Amino acid sequence: MIPFDDDLTACADLVRKGDPDRFATVMAAPVEVRAPLFAIYAFNLELARAPWASSEAMIAEMRVQWWRDVGEEIASGGPVRRHFVATPLAKVLTSELAGHIDSMAEARRWDIYRDPFEDEAALAAHIDKTTGSLMWMAAATLGASDEALVRRFAYGVGVANWLRAIPKLVAEKRIPLLDGTPSGISALAKTGLEALKEARGQRATLRKSALPGLLPGWQAAAILRQAVAEPQRVAEGTLGTSEFRRRAGLIYRVSTGRW
């Protein structure tokens, strides 16, 4: 068990303020696994914010590159620069898991510019390198060994998260969807639902210890079903359930282990 020091306390506070859904899942997890999850999720927040640190592309690129360098330092097993997130992250990640930071950072470069995705495969790859790699980091740190299964589940979660982020991305002059028509949105949401279904069909093969790493997907199915039935909710920014259903859903997933 990794002790909570000042760095991890700061990581937890960062996640609490910046990613309340993932914070809720960590607090629902056993005490002994909270520290590594807070370090991983704090890293994700810092990396996700890096492209938006400046309207000047060169500065934003430098911020993203900083995290690529951190990933390389951790992966190489050498000294890691002092930083309240990077320092505990280095204690949590194996060299192999740290190796994913480079592709995660590369994917985040999309946020710096205003180019659309080339095709559906490019969008899917973006989701896999962001949500997929993040969920694999968390689950693998907690004992998961089936990367393909975790990433399949994460794809569905990532599509749900992506659809919820559409209004903000559009407001920032980005082009997040290949087909923003109602039918196009519904079709994308259906691919997410299918991924969740496929992954959950193999639920029994995942180690129970890894459950907290998959809990951030507890709302995904409900959100995707909304997007299929009412695709206009995406542009309106109204995807999501009530606070009561949100809390009840998380409690159900934790108590039953049915991620």
Regions found by a protein language model. Give the residues of each.
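Helix-hairpin-helix/helix-loop-helix acidic hairpins
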Residues: 111-147
